[in-house]
Amino acid sequence: MTMSFVRKDRPTIVGMLRSTTADLLVAEIDRMLQQGVDAFGFQHEIVQADERNEENYKKIFSAMQGKPAYITNYVRCNVLDLTDEQLTEELFLLVKLGAKLVDLRCDLFDRQPDEYSTDPVAIEKQKKLIDQLHAMGVEVLMSAHVLKYTPYERVLEIALAQQARGVDVVKIVTEANSEQELAENFKISLALQEQIKMPVLFLCNGTHCRKHRIFAPLLDNGLYLAGEYGGPGVNQPTIQEAKEQLQLAGYNDLP
């Protein structure tokens, strides 16, 4: 299928929503539209349990005014204790109501500490799910939140495994807790572009992650996952910071 969520001409600015109720999400979306974003990231796992209903979802997607939505429904940070089958059911509802890029964990149906499963049964179920989502006209991102510094060889192994499962975007999150680890992560960002034949979202958390979060999207023409505001403990750049970097790099067609 033709890739549409990730831009080919420059990094895509994705406004990552952090609110937990429908009314607050609509207000946050409106503010982000005024700041200028290409798309939205709807982190469904943090939405309050009593706010999870079709009426609210329709209101949220409508507020995006036609901008595409990337949706996550992780186990981590989820306010409910749900099985992977239940999490998947919620994703299908969100797709029917307007989501365009769906995030599936790389350990879906076989939970692992680093979110990377090699279980053949789980992988086959993942592939069938990916085919179902493609048939619904949406794109699929597969994520592995390793959440520790990870050498290139291991990152490449995970990325190739994700690619082989039939997704449209590869996502891996590690850490950088020293200048050396930060430098290695920049090298990994560049190396993945030569080995992976699809958009790659390689991110890191940790004490030294900010430079990578700000500059790596310019190296791999990837996604800027950006927030409305920054502050202590916030790894993601703000929307304004992302746009400033793109302007400095010579991009003028910004939202």
Where are the model-predicted features located?
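Catalytic alpha/beta core domains of metabolic enzymes, predominantly
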Residues: 107-255
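A short, compositionally biased domain-edge/stem linker segment
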Residues: 1-3
